Amino acid sequence: MADRGDAARRLDHAAARHLSGAFGLSRAALQRLVAEGRVRVNGVAASRPAQRLQAGDAVDLDLPPPPPRPAPSAERLPLEILYEDDALLVVCKPPGLVAHPSYAHKTGTLLNALLWHAGDRHAGEPSWQPRLVQRLDKDTSGLLVAAKSADVQTALQSARAGFMKEYLAVVWGRPVPARGTIDLRLGRDPLDRRRVMARDGGAAAVTQYHVLARSRGDARGLSLVRCELVTGRTHQLRVHLAARGWPIVGDQAYGEAPRARLAAVALDRRARAFGRQALHAWRLRFTHPRSERVLQFDAPLPADMAALVAAAGMERALPQVAVS
């Protein structure tokens, strides 16, 4: 369904806007679909890609079945493993590494590295298939669990596993109160399906937060925040913090820096130039599906985020393990 943002747009532009992320469809591919009679507007076959839409127009696409996606290949990539047994692994993902192959990132992912690890350890064909239990955004660093079998993956994703995930974030502003709960429903942005927004009727999403420190000498400044996910929605922390007026430093999608500059000029420049969202999954706790032991893992901040925290004079407030 065309929305207000599609009014007067070309058909191919509007369709690409909604479908490029989810289906990997380019404008050229959409133009071919129009030429093949596979696109209908309000029940009538579209005559040309440049046809203009109106808000409320119903657009139907008859998509051909996608070609089978090749199985991810093993790649020798750096891999930081904190724990491994015959059922699972716990790894620390660096910033900039995609967790799972996608249309945009077919190689060079964490899963490719895990496949190499499986084969390398077992001399040839892997005897187990890594299955990521949860994911992190490309530019979010920190802890992830990979199961070695489907039954372990299912068990870890059940409520019995009791997953607890904590993050450290550097945000713009001074969260008030210093400790609290953010309870905002989240859903896809109707104008950009790649984004998430707080909206009525969305999925329940709850975040608990605690301000650990504030940067020195500025009424606005930066804050170091510890967050626990009660639920695990896509982009939950990024959207929740931004919705409260405390966007994460470096977040290109949700974290636009405030126009007002910080009094500390060097810190302001460093924060505005930070190349990714300053978000790190630092603690993970869960019940092992076989031994039923409660396992907890901590990961120190990566160097870029640790330097930002230190520049803001907040390093003493870090949980002890988060200091390299």
Give each language-model segment a name.
Residues 36, 42, 231, 290-291:
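Residue-level recognition of short loop/turn positions
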Residues 57-58, 233, 293:
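Structural motif
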Residues 73-76, 164, 198-207, 278-279:
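Short coil-to-beta-strand transition motifs
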Residues 1-191, 216-218, 301-315, 319-324:
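RNA pseudouridine synthases
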Residues 192-231, 244-265, 269-270, 295-324:
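Accessory recognition modules or surfaces
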Residues 99, 106-118, 148-153, 188, ...:
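Pseudouridine synthase
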